[in-house]
Amino acid sequence: MNQSRGIRQRPSGTGLDLQFRLVLLLVMLPQLFLLTLSLGSGWSFPGLLPDRIDFGPWRDLAIFSGLSSAALNGLLLSAATGLVSTTCGLMLSRCIRRMTGKLRRLGQAAVLFPFAISPAVAAVCLFDLSARIGLAGTFTGVLLCQSIFGSAAATVILLEGWGETAERREQLVRMLGGGTLDVWRHAIWPQVRGLLGICFLQSALFAWLDYGVVLHIGGGRVPTLTLRLFTLIRESSVNHAALATLLLLSPAMLALTILSIGGLFVTRRKALAMEQQR
């Protein structure tokens, strides 16, 4: 009996290219429609083009309007949230990993608690506390509240980086006379550096796209693109809302494009290596 019948054939390079282009087309079609709307003023359903092409929204963005200032403020907030969340997640995951027995299980369960409620509900519950300590309506208050969810996600991811290999490396460095800095440099950093980028990007994207926390804790005093987008929608400014949506989705789309191209490049290299082996 021919055993090759039970082996699934690997997709060819041409098939992978076709699939990638199809997925890319489906993803980019809504973005192209939003880009078209942002190039002009007015729009009537079911038309695909604005009433007139005058580049009004982009001119408003170029003169540093409220949209551009909200984008810059949101970018700063997301970067700060990613940095704080990744740092806290690294410390918390290390502490939980060094616990034993029921205490470790309790720590792992506590980390999952922020995922039990939505950020908007948590922001409503934390508003009174933030108002009492003077953080309501401030950049710092929004940052700390967003970091609760970002730190929880980073901790869950980084818990996978603390295994027996990391513990053995740490013991080896200490046996060779290394200090705390040497332990972090030679034992801990090589083990978790690949996860730190994932934690930072995930936390930063959460802060960039967040609406509930910024609305309730910020109280409208911390401008971000999400707040500006819903304001434009309520004001029926479809063209400016399309531009705000493009800016809001640009980091995620950029990351998706880079990952897709990188994955396709790796797949092609593997396919070429297999063909050379044959």
For every predicted segment, state its role.
Residues 72, 76, 102-108, 165-199:
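Amphipathic cytosolic juxtamembrane alpha-helices at the membrane-cytosol interface
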Residues 19-21, 27-31, 141, 147-148, ...:
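Transmembrane alpha-helices
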Residues 29-32, 36-39, 87-91, 124, ...:
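Membrane-embedded alpha-helices of multi-pass transport/permease systems
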Residues 2-13, 43-45, 58-66, 208-265, ...:
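Interhelical loop and adjacent transmembrane-helix boundary motif
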Residues 1-36, 256:
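N-terminal signal-anchor/first transmembrane alpha helix
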Residues 71, 96, 113, 160, ...:
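Short hydrophobic faces within alpha-helices
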Residues 103, 120-151, 181, 217-220:
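Membrane-interfacial helix termini and adjacent extracytoplasmic/periplasmic loops
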Residues 2-13, 79-111, 124-128, 170, ...:
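Transmembrane-helix boundary motif in ABC transporter permease subunits
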